């Protein structure tokens, strides 16, 4: 049968396709949502968010029992950037409709002015007839800046969260005084851990990306 190509972009909803008769194998190419950037302080910029992971799986065999079954595709959204100001809220998380969303960025310190962390990216997942076959982790969020130092960038390697459920990225750590908020973890097969808020009037640290399947 001729090659059939379908492309799915982020919509915030679960998208579906049906495996047509005559299909022997499929190739899947996934990109997770990127982490949002941390916001700035007067002393410098926040950290950039990490890019979402790319996963490629080719020649996945399709059995006769899988013909006319449903492929579920959940494209992960990008995390939002942080904002600046006393107590500025962290960037909202990147969403994933299958429970693989990133965390929210950490809030800036309440006094007097710093940057908050960026939200973690949501993972992109593909399921066939309810079975997960591929996941591309979302990127970690960048950290907010303090007056004394910049926020650090989101990190594109995974350190798995111990929270439950484990597929969600961890929320960035809030700053309790004057300083930048931490970047959030990205969603993934193992959700990423968050970065910390800066000590004193310093920038925070970036979050970790989610892992892949």
Enumerate the predicted regions with their spans.
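Extended extracellular/luminal ectodomain segments enriched in beta-structured repeat modules
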Residues: 20-27, 65-69
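Glycine-rich strand-loop-strand elements at beta-sheet edges
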Residues: 11, 32-128, 142-160, 167, ...
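Local beta-strand/beta-hairpin segments that build beta-sheet-rich folds
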Residues: 132-134
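Intrinsically disordered, low-complexity, charge-biased terminal/linker regions in eukaryotic proteins
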Residues: 166-172
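A short aromatic-anchored loop/beta-hairpin motif
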Residues: 3-10
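Surface-exposed ligand/attachment interfaces on beta-rich extracellular proteins
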Residues: 10-21
